[in-house]
Amino acid sequence: MKHKRRFICRMICALALSAPLVVKAQSEQSFVLDTLHLPGTMNVVEPELLKKGVVNNALDALNGQTAGVNVTSNGLDRMAMLNSVRVRGTTSIMGGNDPLVIIDGVTSDVATLATIYPADIESFTVLKNASETALYGSRGASGVIQVKTKKGTGRGFQISYEGNCGLEAMCKSMEMLNAAEYIAAAQKLGLEYNDKGYNTNFRKAITRTGQVQNHYLAFSGGTPHSNYRASFGYIDHNTIIRSKGYRNLVAKIDVTQKAFGDRLTGDFGVFGSSFKNNDIFDNQMLFYSADAMNPTYPYDRVNGSWLKNGSASQINPPGALLVERNDTKNMNFNAHLKLSYDISKDLSVSGFGAYSYASNENDQFCPTWVWAQGNLYRGEFKSEEWLANVQANYQHVWGIHDLKAMAGAEYQKDVRSGFWTSAKGITNNDMGYHNIGVAASRPFGGTDSNYEDPSLASVMAGADYTLLGRYAVSVSVRGDGSSMVGDDHTWGFFPSLSLSWNMKREKWLRHIDDITMLKLRTGYGRSGNLGGISSYTTMNTVRQNGIVSINSSPTVTMGMIRNNNPDLKWETRSTWNIGADVGLWNNRLVMTAEYYYSKTTDMLYAYDVPVPPFAYDKLLANIGSMSNQGLEIGFSVTPVQKKDMELNINMNLAWQKNKLLSLSGEYEGMQMSAADVTAMGGLSGAGQHGGYNNVVYQIVGQPLGVFYLPHCKGLVVVGNGHYRYDIEDLDRNGTVDLSDGGDRYIAGQATPKVTLGSNVSFRYRDWYLSLQMNGAFGHKIFDGTGLAYNNMSSFPDYNVLKGAPEKNIVDQNVSDYWLENGDYLNIEYLTVGYDVPIKKGVVKSLRLSLSVNNLATITGYSGLTPMINSYVVNSTMGIDDKRTYPVYRTYSMGLSIQF
């Protein structure tokens, strides 16, 4: 393998510059287009760019690799507990913002993708333009991620192993008062305090050196006519927080068989995973308690009991909180079979079938020393999916004409069910959640179940015509019929049209050797979104409302929970894009740029309606609209390319602007509109000691998720050396009003305006170095942690940050005082490796590596970390609300060997 390590120089916006690319319908039955003729942008992330030190999650492998794709995973904002991906921004308020995931032709989701073992992934292909996603119809509005896993090569028997072991060390945490500082501050301020005689750093007490190990073993063999591949992966991660960790076991088998003179090809695959996560019941309570606990208290039990400060009702002894449990077990299974038959040189047909099963178990336990009566919860959720697809593909070249076409049909059926129960009144904490019968009471509504069985039928067709090898037009249409929309809108149709011009093949440019590629492209298409609709959204539905006595027997009463809306239909996203791709000097320098504008219409929103005439006070209707526009720029350069040395630099930049256009319109002759200003997120949970707490808002005419805050002119003395925030009377009416409609102004947005991803790879003989950097700019973060931890009105019952006693602020109302720039540049990983020279023998290649993940973050943000949830629209968006999970760095060693 000496000198043969190939550094991928793919464009992060990228074109696979020489290989053909596949435009795939939902089951990968497809027609092949030459990349240079492709009117849209398909972003391919190849295997070399997925090697990022310790990668515990396939989503982490994708982060920063392609422009306009933002990944929020548990590895970034651990307190938000998100596994989400946004492709070119948020497109809906009610849901369906995660992209459609296709794993080896099987429809899936981001949660399942997170369980795929990273080393099993051959490549990611991200589809962003509607001219590409229209083939996915009602589920393509938020983009599509195609995942291709590794298959047999047909080169005889091979064995490969990849392993990685690492340690996690805390590198940054909240600096709270120690015992001596705590006592000195209380005495200086003349406050009564409890002194138990200890000096405890509770943050260090609940943490440890984290350990992570990944092991991956793969077998493959056979011939080009009959081959197989089997792989097994295992991840064991004991996190930096005591008692928290997870394990993921993955197994996968793929078999390919050809027959009848290679005219028939059969592909069969089986995938299974088991993911077990051990967590605690209330993470925010744990971290706030560890920070705010009186440092003179002990960490361990005293005489068999936890020592608790009765005056601090919002915290508990951190050691007691670590006994809580919130455990999950996710099981996934999939089997799929694809048969393809070449009827002639130009015509082929294929059939694809898949079955998927998933189960999720969630078990929770909260002991009586945390909650007076304790709490138990057990839930089990299952889903099954059947998918069938048939397709015909035609391809013919005659003279200067090249035509590729496809037509197909698809049917998908899902069945989802769940059951859960909760109880309290625990008499014995030793059994945890394993014996729910020891609990004395079952709260009303704590036991429930659900069931839904949506189905989707589809027809699709597409064609690609190329003239003279340089002028290309591509058209497609897909029709989806869903059981979840209203009867009058069962079918939705999603067309697309795109054009491209390969200028390099023009006579006047063909002989200019310095220009390897020059292409212009544009396209328009429509795609749909069903994410905001459930199986029974179009119907009047009821649920249990209470218990009354009828004839001396307890009887459950029922009440309305939803108005029916037979006019519910798809949200529709229309996108127009125009772009250019340039390659110079044999593609040692590749540049790409694309502008896009998309508009979501018929956007779903839950409107307030009068009762009567409606039976319920909310109505879900298709009335709103939202836009996204942006510019994506990328380049890939190879400044050094020699036998013993090579340097590649890849970079992508994305500018993105979102705007909530309208939430007003008519429904059956009735004018409907949402409130001008609606709170989306605020400070909550442990550590919120009163005050106005709404921070992030939804405002028509603004980006979704803006900071709408009072303006603080500074601090003002209020007596006894205390300070409060000096809030400006913005409307000049003589009264400061902190409510949602009061003295507030739009102070910035939570979503970054610009994102950056960059990868640098360098090889010198058998040594190599790889560096990944990601960044986000142009957004704000509200430091709710700083607000809470500097609030001296709760001291000394609750500990505070170093420096807080000197500021002596006794105010917890929100304002722009705690709003900061969220810009950052993070060095995600640095890897140094060595390819051991192998001359002869059983071993074909051997690679050793050392990696550091989360090497450094350059930022002006004063909080713990700027890498919080800045993309997913929920109550945590843009808010650092006591999300004080320690920042840690991972040091790891890797081994890769092939036989």
Feature roles, as predicted:
Residues 101, 300, 465, 706, ...:
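Short aromatic-centered micro-motifs
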Residues 160-195, 420-422, 621, 638-748, ...:
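Conserved small-residue
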Residues 749-781:
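Glycine-rich, aromatic-lined ligand/substrate-binding cores of catalytic
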Residues 734-735, 768-828:
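C-terminal beta-barrel architecture of Gram-negative outer-membrane proteins
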Residues 98, 210-213, 248, 254-260, ...:
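Extracellular/periplasmic, surface-exposed regions of secreted and cell-surface proteins
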Residues 284-319:
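Acidic, glycine-rich flexible loop segments
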Residues 1-259, 264-273, 318, 332-334, ...:
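Short, small/polar-rich motifs associated with maturation and membrane association
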